[in-house]
């Protein structure tokens, strides 16, 4: 899942291409893991990088890396040294649960609680819930008279294309400062052109309704005719 655009890549298909070669499949799972299916072994993922701040529901500060046997062989053959991100050093101390460096203990405690929530619900149920919320959000956006940006959308994030002439930066600022809802805007060449709404983690249907309302109010400030009622009605029907 590419966070800045809301595009979901077909990692399974990529794995089928890479598995018989000497290349490594390295996957950015920072936003996707915990929200959409990601089957490391079945999809032949060699390295999966995950962050704590998205679907794993805690502040940024923790990162996780899974490494395949194929990737370990490549790492072991690399002569160039490194320091903090030395995976070989981390692997050496892992069996003893003796971190190579001082760990962020408060974040680890928070992560344990967040993972308990995921395990209690069941990861397959989490994926299904996020999928339903994401699909319903896209339906709502279209019913409001707006467009989504991604042609291959991820369910954990909906990217809304700003209408012609609308300042997306001002939309984000209004939602945050006036409506009390903090969305994400676009990055680089998409800055001011899109607004991103999450449906991952602990976000529920009521949070999304509040977000849609905030977006509609921000767009109305720029004289955009938005049918919020139709959007919320379509959203609720899509969840039934």
Where are these regions (language model features)?
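Conserved PLP-binding catalytic core of the aspartate aminotransferase-like
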Residues: 147-178
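Active-site C-terminal subdomain of aminotransferase-like
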Residues: 53-139, 143, 240
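Active-site phosphate-binding strand-loop segment of PLP-dependent enzymes
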Residues: 1-34, 47
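PLP-dependent enzyme catalytic core of the Aspartate aminotransferase-like
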Residues: 189, 193-240
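A short linear hydrophobic-aromatic micro-motif
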Residues: 145-148, 181-186
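A common structural junction motif
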Residues: 177-183, 217-219
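Conserved active-site segment immediately N-terminal to the catalytic lysine
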Residues: 41-53
């Amino acid at each position: 899942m590419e966070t800045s655009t809301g595009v979901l890549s077909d990692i399974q298909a990529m794995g089928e291409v890479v598995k018989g070669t000497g290349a490594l499949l390295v996957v950015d799972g920072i936003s996707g893991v915990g929200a959409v299916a990601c089957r490391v072994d079945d999809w032949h993922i060699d390295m999966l990088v995950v962050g704590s701040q998205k679907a794993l529901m805690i502040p940024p500060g923790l990162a996780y890396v899974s490494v395949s046997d194929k990737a370990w062989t490549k790492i072991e053959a690399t002569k160039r040294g490194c320091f903090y991100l030395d995976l070989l050093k981390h692997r050496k101390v892992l069996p003893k649960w003796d971190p190579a460096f001082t760990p962020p203990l408060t974040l680890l405690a928070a992560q344990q609680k967040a993972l308990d929530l995921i395990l209690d619900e069941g990861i397959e149920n989490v994926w299904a819930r996020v999928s339903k919320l994401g699909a319903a959000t896209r339906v709502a956006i279209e019913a409001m008279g707006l467009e989504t940006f991604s042609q291959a959308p991820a369910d954990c994030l909906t990217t809304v294309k700003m209408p012609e002439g609308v300042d997306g930066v001002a939309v984000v600022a209004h939602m945050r400062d006036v409506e009390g809802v903090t969305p994400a805007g676009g990055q680089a060449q998409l800055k001011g052109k899109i607004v991103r709404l999450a449906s991952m983690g602990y976000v529920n249907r009521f949070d999304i309704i509040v977000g849609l309302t905030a977006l509609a109010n921000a767009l109305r400030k720029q004289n955009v005719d938005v049918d919020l009622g139709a959007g919320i009605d379509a959203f609720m029907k899509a969840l039934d």
